[in-house]
């Protein structure tokens, strides 16, 4: 007795539904890959689970290329059928195209982040690895360039500061030199004035006090008249009481 025809309907049990989805999805992806390889056909397969998770397959990982070809074909077909497509329908088509591209880009982004890799074939994984290596190489090159530019800028700032410090040191030394020179001149002027200025002293004699002028030569002295050097009251002879 042969098997009866199984009626297709929604599986009510959540676990059984998930298991069936996983098995059928793998089989569908496998069939898509087989027809692509055996028949040299360009195949694009997009599957969304009940939770909104995306699963896809495309020949040689060219989903965007196949979708663009599909859009061109669809647009050309509509042009042949009739050119009375309204503007709103054009916007709907453009929206669908952009939405498909966004979904593909989001899928690629997740793949680059190391997510949703189970659905990728070996060839797709190798292509993804190559793209990541190229991206890392480009990032490392830009990082090294940025570090070099930063070091060069710091060296320029250091040179400017060094030149500024040298200029300040030069000014300080010049001011110190001028200060020392002025102090030496002041000392010399002070010494010269003390040598040239006459010194007076009083000496006593039998008749009273007389003045004596001391000049540069201390050995030579001249006596002055008492009344010409000192007032009269200071020249009166003292008396012993």
UniProtKB/Swiss-Prot annotation:
> Molecular function (GO) terms listed?
DNA-binding transcription factor activity; protein dimerization activity; RNA polymerase II transcription regulatory region sequence-specific DNA binding
Family annotation (PROSITE patterns): K_BOX (PS51297), MADS_BOX_1 (PS00350), MADS_BOX_2 (PS50066)
Pfam families (alphabetical): K-box (PF01486), SRF-TF (PF00319)
Biological process (GO), any one: positive regulation of transcription by RNA polymerase II
Name the keywords, alphabetized. DNA-binding, Nucleus, Transcription, Transcription regulation
Q: Where is the MADS-box domain?
A: 3-57
Q: What is the protein's given name? A: Agamous-like MADS-box protein AGL8 homolog
According to its UniProt entry, this protein's organism is Sinapis alba (White mustard)
Q: Give the taxonomic lineage as stored in the record.
A: Eukaryota, Viridiplantae, Streptophyta, Embryophyta, Tracheophyta
What gene makes this protein? Answer: AGL8
């Amino acid at each position: 007795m042969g098997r009866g025809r199984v009626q297709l309907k929604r599986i009510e049990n959540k676990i059984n539904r998930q298991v069936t989805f996983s098995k059928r999805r793998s089989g569908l992806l496998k069939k898509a890959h087989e027809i692509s390889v055996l028949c040299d056909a360009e195949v694009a397969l997009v599957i969304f689970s009940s939770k909104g998770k995306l699963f896809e397959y495309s020949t040689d990982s060219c989903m965007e290329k196949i979708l663009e070809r599909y859009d061109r074909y669809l647009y050309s077909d509509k042009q042949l059928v009739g050119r009375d497509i309204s503007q709103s329908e054009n916007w709907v088509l453009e929206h669908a195209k952009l939405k498909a591209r966004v979904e593909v880009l989001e899928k690629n982004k997740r793949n680059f982040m190391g997510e949703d890799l189970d659905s990728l074939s070996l060839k797709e994984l190798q292509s993804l690895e190559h793209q990541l290596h190229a991206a890392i190489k480009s990032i490392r090159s830009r990082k090294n360039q940025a570090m070099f530019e930063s070091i060069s800028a710091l060296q320029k700032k250091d040179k400017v500061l060094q030149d500024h410090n040298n200029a300040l040191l030069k000014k300080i030394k010049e001011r110190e030199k001028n200060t020392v020179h002025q102090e030496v001149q002041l000392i010399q002027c002070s010494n010269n004035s003390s040598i040239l200025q006459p010194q007076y002293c009083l000496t006593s004699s039998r008749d009273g006090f007389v003045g004596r002028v001391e000049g540069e030569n201390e050995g030579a002295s001249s006596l002055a008249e008492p009344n010409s050097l000192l007032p009269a009251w200071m020249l009166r002879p003292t008396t012993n009481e």
